[in-house]
């Protein structure tokens, strides 16, 4: 059966384990899930191709619902500055920070951006990721933001991984432009972006001294008018009330939430906005983690994502996310699986297509190199994915 909504609170623990069944796939869809004898009685399987997963655990493909996949250049040296004790402002003054990525992304050709992001997608696919949300936000001008979105569009056509596109010009305020002027320019360009790109979502970095709550309200309301679904980088550094605000906007997800307030937790529990947690970023920045247990125990729907980006979390590692979620945020492995599958599907408006092994859904699934999904956390930090099936085709097979 189709899961028609995300799993909230204690329901995140229920993953619907099935033993001794086989999955029948026709074209790119799941046709049936049943014991072999039932399938043989109902279907002619003489010509069926068999993928033997005997003794292995099979899960839905993972969905990485928050990434900054496309950027130019790299900032490896900056990480060493951070380790030596420099704060963000010092790094900015040395030519690092988001401004460095903006400069390099503006300078990069579309082909260079495609080549770099394609390699990242290859890495993600090997770890069982079959759908990725990808944001713009390293252009901070119409030309480069659109270039990033077109890269996402082209990658979606050439790569096995499905991509979901998010317009995020409101990621930072570009040098030499006043905030009000920049906000007005973003709003003026919304119609053009909607018309000329495949961007489905609009996202804002809602933070003190960047886009405050009033700025965010103005931007999200304008984006909604133009038909964008909404996301928000909310309550990461300072509790501005972003979570409770985006629930009133019926946003698809509120992401980060390290500093979410009690009112924010309550609003997320009562609404349908997914709370997307990004433990890799907290780990990389050596900050406290988002309050996963508090959110779950209050009845929220949690997703987990990598936040892959060139600065605060240069990692697409799903094994790392799983380890941090379980060991640093006290989530169970079942809750983590829910957060990387069905709830992550909800976070990209794909609940009816992907996120669970169900009849009629897209045949996106992964086979682990172990009989139990417990291997995902038991074999710490190691990729347990042996085979990836995307739209009914084997797109990755580990040969050891």
Positions of predicted regions on the chain:
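N-terminal metal-binding scaffold of metallo-dependent hydrolase/deaminase domains
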Residues: 1-42, 373-375
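C-terminal cap of metal-dependent C-N hydrolases
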Residues: 6-14, 340-342, 359-400
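Divalent metal-coordination and catalytic microenvironments
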Residues: 23, 28, 55, 66, ...
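Conserved beta-strand scaffold positions in the cores of enzyme catalytic domains, especially
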Residues: 47-52, 165, 388
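Metal-associated gating/positioning segment near the N- to mid-region
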Residues: 48-116
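Metal-coordinating catalytic core of metallo-dependent amide/deamination hydrolases
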Residues: 101-116, 122, 130-241
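Catalytic core of soluble alpha/beta enzymes
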Residues: 182-197, 211-297, 313-315
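His/Asp/Glu-enriched, well-ordered alpha-helical/loop segment
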Residues: 225-230, 248-249, 286-370
């Amino acid at each position: 059966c189709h899961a028609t909504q995300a799993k909230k609170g204690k329901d995140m623990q229920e993953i619907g384990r099935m033993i001794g069944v086989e999955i029948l796939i026709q074209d790119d869809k799941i046709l049936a899930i049943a014991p072999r004898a039932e399938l043989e009685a109902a279907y002619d399987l003489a010509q069926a191709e068999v993928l033997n997963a005997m003794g292995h655990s099979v899960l839905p493909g993972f969905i990485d619902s928050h990434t900054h996949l496309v950027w130019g250049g790299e900032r490896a040296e900056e990480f060493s500055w951070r380790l030596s004790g420099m704060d963000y402002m010092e790094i900015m003054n040395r030519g690092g920070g988001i401004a460095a990525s903006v400069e390099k992304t503006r300078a990069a050709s579309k082909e260079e951006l495609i080549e770099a992001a394609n390699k990242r997608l290859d890495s993600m696919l090997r770890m069982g990721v079959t759908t990725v949300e990808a944001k713009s936000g390293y252009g901070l001008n119409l030309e480069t933001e659109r270039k990033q979105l077109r890269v996402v569009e082209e990658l979606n056509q050439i790569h096995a991984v499905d991509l979901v596109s998010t317009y995020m010009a409101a990621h930072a305020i570009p040098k030499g432009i006043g905030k009000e002027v920049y906000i007005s320019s973003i709003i003026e360009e919304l119609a053009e972006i909607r018309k000329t790109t495949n961007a489905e979502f609009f996202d804002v970095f809602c933070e003190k001294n960047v886009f405050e709550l009033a700025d965010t309200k103005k931007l999200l309301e304008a984006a909604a008018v133009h038909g964008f679904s909404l996301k928000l980088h909310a309550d990461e550094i300072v509790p501005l009330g972003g979570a409770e605000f985006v629930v009133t906007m019926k946003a698809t997800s509120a992401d980060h939430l390290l500093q979410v307030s009690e009112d924010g937790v309550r609003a997320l529990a009562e609404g349908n906005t997914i709370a997307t947690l990004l433990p890799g970023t907290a780990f990389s920045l050596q900050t406290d983690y988002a309050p996963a247990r508090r959110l779950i125990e209050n009845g929220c729907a949690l997703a987990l994502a990598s936040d892959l980006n060139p600065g605060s979390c240069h990692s697409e590692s799903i094994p790392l996310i799983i380890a941090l979620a379980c060991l640093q945020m006290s989530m169970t492995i079942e809750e983590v699986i829910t957060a990387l599958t069905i709830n992550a599907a909800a976070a990209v408006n794909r609940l009816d297509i992907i996120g669970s092994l169900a009849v009629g859904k897209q045949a996106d699934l992964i086979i682990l190199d172990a009989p139990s999904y417990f291997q995902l956390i038991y074999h710490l930090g190691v990729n347990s994915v042996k085979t990836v099936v995307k739209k009914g085709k084997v797109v990755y097979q580990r040969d050891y």
